[in-house]
Amino acid sequence: MTSRARYLVGIDLGTTNSAVAFVDGQAADKRVTLFDVPQLVAPGEIAPRRQLPSFLYLAGEHDLGPAETALPWDRARRTVVGELARAQGARMPERMIASAKSWLCHAGVDRQAAILPWGSDEPEKLSPIDAQAAILEHVRQAWDATHPGAPFASQEVMVTVPASFDEAARELTLEAARRAGYGPIVLLEEPQAAFYAWVDSHPAGERAAAALAPGSQVLVFDIGGGTTDFTLISVGADGESFDRTAVGDHLLLGGDNVDLTLAKQVEQRLVAASGRKLDALEWHGLVHSCRLAKETLLGDQTQESVAITVAGRGSRLIGGTRRDQVSRDELELILLDGFFPLIERGALPQRTRGGLSELGGLPYAADPAVTRHLASFLHRHEVSRIDAVLFNGGAMTPAALRRRVVDQLAAWQPEHGAPRELANRTPELAVAQGAAYYGLVRRGLGARIRGGTARAFYVGAASTGGRSDTAVCAAPKGLEEGEAAALARDFELVTNRPVSFRLFSSSSREDEPGALVPIGDGTPDLVGEGDSDLLELPPIVTVLRAPGRSRATVRLEVRITELGALEVWCRDTGGEGQWRLSFDMRAGGAARENEAAQSDPDPRTPEARGLIAQAFSGSGPLKPAGLMKALEETLAARRDEWSLATLRALFDAALEVEEERRRSPDHEARWLNLCGFTLRPGRGATLDEWRTRQMWRVFNLGLAHEKAEACRLAWWIVWRRIAGGMTQGQQEQLYDRLAQLFLPSFKQKKKLAEIKPTREETAEMLRTLANLERLTVSSKIKLGDEVVRRLGEGRKAREDGLNFWALGRIGGRVPLYGPVNTVVPPQRAGEWLAAALDMDWPDPEKAAFPMAQLGRRTGDRARDLDDDLRARLSARLRAVPGGERLARLVDEVVALEAREERVALGDTLPAGLRLLPDSD
């Protein structure tokens, strides 16, 4: 992008469809024009289309030939984007990537990993970021092919994102653009873009504001393929200006949810007719067919029904095809009753532990009723009157849905009557058109929507009571592009090592900088359900490089760049430097469920740290053997009651005396045990990634007293306890080291005979291996196969329950901390479970819980085991004392209780801490 760019390009990067529009900045008539995107519409056939379907198809060796996927600008292209990708995906869903935008926001998977198409057995896959980048790259290359004299890299580009996207999701979008070869881009919220398109739709010389009375409140009601966005825009008292006054929170609720609901109804009929449930890929094919049927029925008012075909796979391909149909009446009933029910204004979204997760575990909104989410939005922002509604998104094409929303608003505001519907002739294109128009606004040639940032930002701070239960407002809502807000509060930080701040946002609070507010649990509460509406973002981290100084006093500054991105800076009050803080995308993975986990270190922690230094350095009477008891006495609490912050402070103290572990075997064993206990489970606190890196340096150094069994035991225990903080590469390295002992080759068996690990060592090795959730699937399969082999060696191998526990961890359906994309496929896990069910269980209570983890239901067909196998397991579990609860884990989608989580992990957790899967 340059300041003299000829074209202003707006890109609607949609979940289901993308679109591009532009303005020629050098033309006398600066009107918005659609860019018809060249794309493959049939094998070997290129044609321009007004929309670019946001689908990717990864062509195989036999389905599409090289000439059929070639593009004019890339003859060797094998990844198809657009119309052909959508059509071909209906035939081979295992090669199609859909809803990449939703996956980009899914914190439960590694968004850098090649995991899409989800649940597919095909070897070629893409990461969510690379899938989004492929769509953006297609736009760039298509533009360059049709505008040879105006390369895309030289134009000013605006890319839209949902208004509800947090800063982490926006940063991932920027990364996708960078991978697509884009220069700096401007991010614009989709509802604002839709409103800009409405402004631009008025004839030249006619002011859009004149169409609305001064003080009017306009609701932009935007439902796309993957998200629902509510934005409130008010008309200024002068009748000349617009202000964005409120935005809703992130809702993964859109057309995809309709497709899923429709597919579930069709599947019920198919199963009733054939007696067989669809497998994961057949289900994906059905969902895609229902998506196409929905689009057909909504786009063609003359068609009353659409045929649905689900082809069988493998041995079922011939004669395995199943057919049904979707009628217009069925679709409208689902939409009106399920997604747009008429409700009382006080009705709020239902909160459950998960909504639809049939499409690969995407974290969809638990309550599909859009009207309930709308009621919550209006209540939260204290909106009593809506004067006009601008509908946007393909999902709002049916007039019946728009009437339902208008009628609902009218029922909520009888004293004001029904709001007026603002005309939007092309809701599927308006966002791209508005984004291009915004380029003119940035040049001072159009009406700007004021309001700045939709959220206020807060930094975690200890209150006067020493508790980290408050945050201080660092930047208010409404910061405009190019503006900054400085927090008049000093922070004293350690230099030359990582420092971190907890960062929060709120879309509803109106605090001024410096205001203290309660944090709550870091999750925005529904109205009436708590005293906090702060949403916790990934923490912001940096290293303050200041040679010769151990500490620095700094102040924070929040800036909104000219491109609309959030930046947080740390400025030295002594004027010696400034540091930009970046979002730690790998942070998280643990939820603090009570104030014990949120608290600052115990006030007596400095004294406790001194005990650690004394015990290991030999500077006083305290010896390592008596250290833990001394720490409990000093902190006046049992070790399992120490808060997360206290534990990490003690770990940091232990790290400072790492060299002292070499003094004796007892020093080393006690030091390793202390580190494992105080850093467990390796995540949950900011800077845990850095702490784990410091421990990995110890791993590479190895044991100082390798011949001492106590040291060898402590060695494996520490890596098991902190595995949650390890990267996949570190876990694979640990696996390779252990595999030589646990899965030895013929040559390694001879070496193993020389080492002769004790039974206790072998048990700790297995526990460590089983806790490595980030291992590749292939490594887990090798490990699980070996455990099943050992279980089959005889009754003695099944008596203590260790092998059962290990199998439950290795093949568990729901990770405790790792990404779901490394879960063992259900086919292999099913084989393991079937083998275990054929064995006797000497101690059923020791086997029952891990086998429940192996067969646990997730709601994700790419992970769930066969229904009949789970039914066998459920019956077996019910025969065990307390087995009703375990059977429920297998029969239903339910979360683990804290006690069950500890059993699954094989360890205790710091007070108040709960594990969550990876948030990347």
Task: Map each language-model feature to its residues.
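Acidic low-complexity intrinsically disordered segments
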Residues: G183, G312-H381, G446-R683, G702, ...
